[in-house]
UniProtKB/Swiss-Prot annotation:
GO terms for cellular component: extracellular region. Hormone found in the sinus gland of isopods and decapods which controls the blood sugar level. Has a secretagogue action over the amylase released from the midgut gland. May act as a stress hormone and may be involved in the control of molting and reproduction. It comes from Carcinus maenas (Common shore crab). It is found in: Secreted. The modification Valine amide is found at V138. Produced by the medulla terminalis X-organ in the eyestalks and transported to the sinus gland where they are stored and released. GO terms for molecular function: neuropeptide hormone activity. This is Crustacean hyperglycemic hormones. It comes from the Eukaryota.
Length: 142
């Protein structure tokens, strides 16, 4: 009895795996392509400081990658808020392994398109409203 059901179950599992695999691959490559386009647009933007480009070329040390408190953030200083926002940028850096992603994610006190794209690529969009409130709190002018 079991000798007939085991091969059938293995066949079903194999078919399900093969059907899901192309979709998983397309999601990750699609996210990587979007991030490349965002970063390329930021690099060519005249408003972007040249220091970020120097970091990408390796001429300076990217201290902002490890910086927990951004002096441009004029709102509430709460370590828990910064820690939550910092984890998104750190995870995004670990996903793409590009120092420019880390610095662009933190720019303008986390209120930027790269931060949102990082949340999307990390599959965290169901928590976006919660993180948007945190960004508003740390970036609010006094």
């Amino acid at each position: 009895m079991y000798s007939k059901t085991i091969p059938a179950m293995l066949a079903i599992i194999t078919v399900a795996y093969l059907c899901a695999l192309p979709h998983a691959h397309a999601r990750s490559t699609q996210g990587y392509g979007r991030m490349d386009r965002i970063l390329a647009a930021l690099k060519t933007s005249p408003m972007e400081p040249s220091a970020a480009l120097a970091v990408e070329n390796g001429t300076t040390h990217p201290l902002e990658k490890r910086q927990i408190y951004d002096t441009s953030c004029k709102g509430v200083y709460d370590r828990a808020l910064f820690n939550d926002l910092e984890h998104v940028c750190d995870d995004c850096y670990n996903l793409y392994r590009t120092s420019y992603v880390a610095s662009a994610c933190r720019s303008n006190c986390y209120s930027n398109l790269v931060f949102r794209q990082c949340m999307d690529d990390l599959l965290m969009m169901d928590e976006f409203d919660q993180y948007a409130r945190k960004v508003q709190m740390v970036g609010r002018k006094k």
